Amino acid sequence: MRDIVFIERDPYAPIRHCYTVSKILYQGKSPYQEIQVIESPEFGRMLILDGVVQLDEKYEFLYHEYLAHVPLHAHPNPRNVLIIGGGDGGTLREVLKHDIVERAVLVDIDKEVIEVSKKYLPTLSVGFQDPRAIVVNEDGYKYVQDYENEFDVIIVDSTDPVGFAHVLTTEDFFRHVYKALKEDGIFVAQTESIHYHLEMVSNIQQRLKKVFPIVDLYTSVIPIYAGYWWTFSIASKKYPVRTPAREVKVQTKIYDADMHEYAFLPESFYNKIVNGEYKY
């Protein structure tokens, strides 16, 4: 009997990943995208949107812990958090590990992703059961425009910033985010691969610098993502972000106070990336 193999065809990176599939758990289509959940003997369950792997059970913590805990620990009092995207629930789960968080609003345009994750990805979707979680099925770009001085931290956990997610990387969106944040708010977004999307990373950093006084870049190594070396762009109205502002008490697999600082690129290397001086 031949193995079933899933070949990821990421249109935004010149690379192909192949995964052995032991079982196809779900396959369907929402009004916005194709949704699949497969079981891999090496990576556990995997969520695939429009043919691109979004996460795997084995290594998802390398993404969700960094996306959530760096901004939340950089802020001394993050009580109200907005997550745009993240319908799988992984970022919400990590945010709600912080007892100080009183409200976590998750806005994802695709209700089907949330429902599929609740059924097939229980280790990620546990946060939806928390009474502090509020789920809104709307366009995150439009949602954020309705708020001013509302959130302590805003996290964008989107698919690749192209297609309907492209607006979440524009200067216009960043200005709406700035307005929706409180006077000491912090913003973070996943911003793709240093290896294959270097120009995009640099452009997003430049746009953020037009809006926020403090802008920085940190990374994590994520085996299932193109190029492995993944970036997160972070912006702050007030607080420096390279060191935690609070004691790290949350239970994690890898994130801690040391890893928080290690995640940030050396400033000399960071400046080369932002200024477009770093070339392969």
From Swiss-Prot:
Residues annotated as domain PABS: 3-237
GO molecular function terms attached to this record: spermidine synthase activity
Localization: Cytoplasm
Binding site for spermidine: H64, D88, D157, S158, T159, D160
InterPro entries registered for this protein in UniProt: PABS, PABS_CS, SAM-dependent_MTases_sf, Spermi_synthase, Spermidine_synt_N, Spermidine_synt_N_sf
GO terms under biological process: spermidine biosynthetic process
Residues given in the record as S-methyl-5'-thioadenosine binding sites: Q33, D108, D139, G140
Keyword Transferase among record annotations: yes
Main location: cytoplasm
Enzyme Commission number(s): 2.5.1.16
Superkingdom of origin organism: Bacteria
PANTHER family cross-referenced by the UniProt entry: SPERMIDINE SYNTHASE, SPERMIDINE/SPERMINE SYNTHASE
Protein's UniProt name: Polyamine aminopropyltransferase 1
Organism, as annotated: Aquifex aeolicus (strain VF5)
